[in-house]
Amino acid sequence: MSEQEPAQTPSAPRTRSVSRRRLLTYGRNAAIVAGAALAVPATAASAGAAAPATTAKGSLAKARSAASLDTTLTNVVTSWTGNTFSGATEWVQDFVFNIAVTADGAVYTVSFWDEAGDYAGIYKDGHLIGNCHGANGDAVAVNSTYAYLSVGNGLTRYTLDGTATSLTYAVGSPPAAAAATDTQVVATDRANNRVLVFDAATGAVQHTWTVNQPGSVAIAPSGEIWVVSNITRDTNDGHFWHVDTANPAKILHFSNSGAALAGTISGPSAQWIPTSVAVDANGDLLVGDNGPLRQVHTYTGLSGTPALARSLGQAGGIGAGTPGRVAADKFFGIVGVGGDSAGNVYVAMFEFGTWLRKFSPAGAVVWQLQGSAFVDAADFDPASDGVEIYTKQCHYSMAYTKAPGSDATWRSYTLDSVTYPQDARLFLTGHSHAAASPFLKRLGGRLYMYVTGMYCAHLLIYRMDGEIAKPSGAIFKARWNGDDPTWPPNQPATGQWIWRDLSGNGNFEAGEYVQPGDGSSSPSNCWVWYVDDNGDIWEGGDRNLRRYPLQGFDSQQNPIYTYESMETIALPAPFSVVRRLHYDVAADVMYMVGYTPDQPFDNAHWKECGKVLVRYDKWSTGNTTPTWTLLLPWDTASTIVVTMVSLAFAGDYIFAAGIETRGQVWVWKAADASPVGTWTAGSVIGTIDRSGWVDVPYGISATKRADGDYLVQVEDDLFNKVLLYRWTP
């Protein structure tokens, strides 16, 4: 996957071992064909016959000779989006909270999670070369011989190859930041509002002093210390920095023993957010500012009166020029800065992803890395013939004539946290994965994006305003009580609600919420969210289905949905529970998948889409007689558990993905549910264990191109990417 402005191609990476979480041990050739499907034709369905009662190990397995998915489809090209690398030998980690840079340009990172185990990756020359295993948190520092990273309530010393030593530095709480020379290590203790200076060789505390809300820290060549003050950072998944404009953030100047010195840096404005500081090769101070400017400032004259000498990056960051359009010098989510002995500058960015960039002393990008699709699904702009792809916050343009890995160009970043600070994508991602799966729709000539998450508790609505996805509306099944108790502001005290951006500013304001008359919550154990081509929203599936017909658009071009217009629809036979649906408006065909009395729900497999898929023709006429009924692959006794989690419908085919089956796709004909075959990811991503579980209910999407090819995308959380298949029937 390439960037909007490709830099030089990095040389081949070093050979390295890989640590992975939750890997299943089976070979590349062990494609899953167990759990075959059984189709019941229309004649049986019209006679009132339900799908035959089977068990996962019994009749389903025996039915393979009659309705087999053993055929491995070979005319499939595998590619991916969301990560610079495929995951075959290297990948860009899920998150980054801070960086430190050695004199020779090795970038040490730290974070709180990476699905494949690289919480604290080490990068050099545009490649992942190692990891400091066991580190977890916000602080990282380096000197000429060691790295120092957050572990628990302090720091642990690592060798530069990533090996932990027994030497620790007791901060007393998870440190906010750290800096190091060959003789000293400095850490900031945000819980106790203090700075600590340690002897680098022994871990003994040499000095400590008070700083209000300390953040990042740097040590000048003179040994003097610069500390960001009056800044706080969330401890939840968002890890965002905050300042109080009534008490603006400042960078304070101290002697090595903690005596206050002149030269306080107040920044270019009271709104600045100095998230990170570092000293460059010239002895000047680099400051990562994630306020409205979103730039990296350089301050000179540290021995006297510091002065702002220059700023790297366009003022306004990702909001500059064409808002959202990607350029190497347009920043967002700045969390780390650093410099090497040659004067190069390194910038790390985080808004639920990892972006690392290296710039020459003249400000030209040298290389850049991206990992921005951890537990992300993707969808196609329906008007683009599969060329334009969107995840919840990134937009890619595809060139299918190019080789996998070079066919995707990162076109835009659709989230602007400065213009829309209440955007739900800033509050619903992280470990809860409450914003993960987008649905793209063209309505009234405009592009809209609907987003749900792993637990389907809500549906977010965005209107594409150029390259920015502007918050437009939302439907929540109940009051939201997330990590941030202040979000969303003004929501009702209890019950389900619909929000619409009446003012057009993207903020959740009083008077913009509506509720049903009884103030009730919607049943929580419901997994259906579907937006059809008319813009109608389908929801529910527990005891009934609920349809929200699109009521038009308001003056802000927001789609209008109301409780008054909502329709309740009984579940059709043979279902007792519906977990997913797809309504083809043009063909008037409804597909539903779920459980029946003969194929009941199993709480051990709560995320799955169900065992039974049914097609109903002429749905709008009230017909609920199945055209056909299909028993989906389901084998919980096999070495690799086979259960379906997500389906996609395009052209003449139905596509499905399982949870533990790692990017494998099953294919049936939509007309009669006859089996076509299956495929797994190609060697471009490595062996089959180099792809991960499909962790979200809506983790697969598909479209048919004008040339007859089919494109299928599958969420792949293990190595922070989205799989993209191109299949020629």
Show which residues each predicted segment covers.
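N-terminal secretory signal peptides
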Residues: 1-22, 29-45
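Surface-exposed loop and turn segments in beta-propeller and other repeat-based domains
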Residues: 77-88, 263-270, 309-329, 410-430, ...
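Beta-strand-rich domains and repeat architectures in extracellular enzymes and scaffolds
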Residues: 86-116
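Repeated scaffold domains used in trafficking and secretory/extracellular systems
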Residues: 95-98, 135-142, 173-178, 213-217, ...
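Residue-level detector of Asp-centered blade-edge/turn motifs that repeat once per structural unit
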Residues: 101-104, 142-144, 180-182, 219-222, ...
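Conserved beta-propeller blade signature
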Residues: 107-108, 146-149, 185-186, 225-226, ...
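Short, conserved, GDST-rich strand-edge loop motifs in beta-rich repeat architectures
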Residues: 230-246, 460, 480-488, 594-610
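Blade-level signature of beta-propeller repeat domains, shared across WD40, Kelch, NHL, RCC1
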Residues: 697-729
